[in-house]
Amino acid sequence: MAEQLIPIQWKDDALVLLDQTVLPNEVVYESFKTAEGVWDAIQVMKVRGAPAIGVSAAYGVYLGVKEVAESSAEEFIAEVKKVCAYLATSRPTAVNLFWALERMESVAKENAHLSIAQLKDRLLEEAKEIHREDEEINRQIGEHALTLFHDGMGVLTHCNAGALATTKYGTATAPMYLAKEKGWDLKIYSDETRPRLQGSTLTALELQRAGIDVTVITDNMAAMVMSQGKIDAVIVGCDRVAANGDVANKIGTLGVSILAKYYNIPFYVAAPTPTIDLKTPTGKEIPIEERDASEVINRFGQYSAPKESKVYNPAFDVTPYENVTAIITEKGIVRAPFMENLKKLFQ
């Protein structure tokens, strides 16, 4: 079996990230020792996927304050807040980023009685705990999702909600890995996911390396394979779930959900509870990141449209809750009415 790709590691007091911008052609690991480096890695998508962004940001908080000189607890906590506010500007849509930063800030405040050295140690411990928790969350999501699958199923996924977007297993791909462990033969179809192609460069790569049957299709082929009866279920990840069950995920997810509804195919969303944002009432309030035009018209160093073309490049879209069959969390499977049942997860 091919060497395991590990998206996030903590080694020698540094955050080590797998550079996902050069996959699948190169496997490059890069070390980061500053908050500025982590911010850049998140922004240019060397690390991506809501859970992985959250974990990386948590380590980024520690890296941002570990060299702070001895000071009062009040001054140190102010510095933690400053670093958190800075890292929060890296990408606006993934709620895990803000969840992790709020958690790190809370830990600093709750331990204000400690020495500065002890506070720094406590922040690193918390970042490592967030890292460990993510792996267990993913496995639990996979176990719940697997109850909706059966041997021989055809499953469509979009973008990369895989092990490369988390710390292990992934969210949408977790049942695929667990099915492999059970000896099941799922047939996975992975949308390439324009414009950054995470479905082909990342999902296909990691599943293929794991020995899972995966077929790459272009985004505009999804309707065709559904119409041919090749798809029994769709499962995607998400960057944020609003209180009413609306789901923000990689651009193109909305279209896939509409097709699934038309062909009466279950549309599942794999969502760790930190991705569920009860403070955001509906998808209309979710900020949608817009990215550079070059991703659309100059993806591989050559222009595929006139240089002067107007380009609209939202990184995410919002799937309405009406199109969602179920939201799969580490705590269980949530079905409509989502407004009511999502709240129960936190009671």
From Swiss-Prot:
Pathway listed: Carbohydrate degradation
Record-linked InterPro entries: Deoxyribose1P_isomerase_DrdI (IPR043679), IF-2B-related (IPR000649), IF-M1Pi (IPR005251), IF_2B-like_C (IPR042529), Initiation_fac_2B_a/b/d (IPR011559), M1Pi_N (IPR027363), NagB/RpiA_transferase-like (IPR037171)
Listed GO MF terms: S-methyl-5-thioribose-1-phosphate isomerase activity
Site (Transition state stabilizer): 159
Catalytic function, reaction form: 5-deoxy-alpha-D-ribose 1-phosphate = 5-deoxy-D-ribulose 1-phosphate
UniProt keyword Isomerase present: yes
Entry binding sites for substrate: 48-50, 91, 198, 249-250
EC main group: isomerase
Keyword Lyase: no
Active site, renumbered: 239
Single Gene Ontology BP annotation: L-methionine salvage from methylthioadenosine
Sorted UniProt keywords: Carbohydrate metabolism, Isomerase
EC number: 5.3.1.-
Function per UniProt: Catalyzes the isomerization of 5-deoxy-alpha-D-ribose 1-phosphate to 5-deoxy-D-ribulose 1-phosphate, as part of a 5-deoxyribose salvage pathway that recycles this toxic radical SAM enzyme by-product to mainstream metabolites.
Classification via HAMAP family: Deoxyribose1P_isomerase, Salvage_MtnA
NCBIfam families: eIF-2B_rel, PRK05720.1, salvage_mtnA
Family membership noted in the UniProt record: Belongs to the EIF-2B alpha/beta/delta subunits family. DrdI subfamily.
Name by which UniProt lists this protein: 5-deoxyribose 1-phosphate isomerase
Species per Swiss-Prot/TrEMBL record: Bacillus mycoides (strain KBAB4)
